[in-house]
């Protein structure tokens, strides 16, 4: 049986239990998050600054959604609506909905970004769940739905992709 817990801060998953076993990282060591939502950017931007429509905006790694209090619409349905604070970092009017549902034995996470502005909006969106794995058992593997071509490992320099250095880490 699958059970989840969430919180309003960042609309973040705090627990995924399968038959009583916790599957999500506890957030106590190494990293103080468990499953942050990355919006309106994924990753870093150079010098934490971007130019939009001729104006400079500062935004930290992965954007601001993970650090904001969402409104809870119903159990496991959260919404973040633009406000004075978000407009200082991101000049677009939006609603970000995060909906968690358990369907049979599967957790489904649905993200909806609604443009409530009178212009196009641009954004990146991602989930960053950290799973609890006991690597000492050797019971884990990554399985792809279909054969993958080469996957490149991109090296980072100051948190940004160093385009001069990339290595193939998976072939066939």
Protein language model features and the residues they cover:
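Acidic/His-leaning functional-site neighborhoods
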Residues: 2, 18, 57, 63, ...
């Amino acid at each position: 049986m699958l059970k989840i817990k969430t919180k309003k801060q960042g609309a973040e998953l705090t627990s995924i239990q399968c038959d009583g076993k916790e599957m999500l990282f506890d957030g106590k060591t190494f990293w103080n998050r468990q499953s942050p939502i990355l919006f309106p950017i994924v990753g870093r931007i150079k010098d934490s600054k971007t130019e939009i429509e001729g104006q400079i905006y500062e935004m930290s790694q992965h954007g601001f959604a993970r650090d904001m209090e969402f409104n809870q619409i119903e159990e496991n349905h959260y919404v973040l609506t633009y406000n004075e604070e978000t407009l200082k970092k991101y000049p677009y009017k939006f609603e970000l909905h995060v909906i968690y549902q358990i369907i049979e034995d599967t957790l489904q996470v649905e993200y909806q970004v609604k443009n409530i502005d009178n212009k196009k909006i641009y954004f990146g969106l991602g989930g960053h769940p950290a799973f609890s794995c006991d690597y000492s058992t050797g019971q884990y593997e990554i399985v792809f739905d279909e054969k993958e071509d080469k996957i490149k490992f991109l090296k980072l320099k100051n948190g940004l992709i160093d385009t001069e250095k990339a290595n193939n880490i998976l072939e066939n």
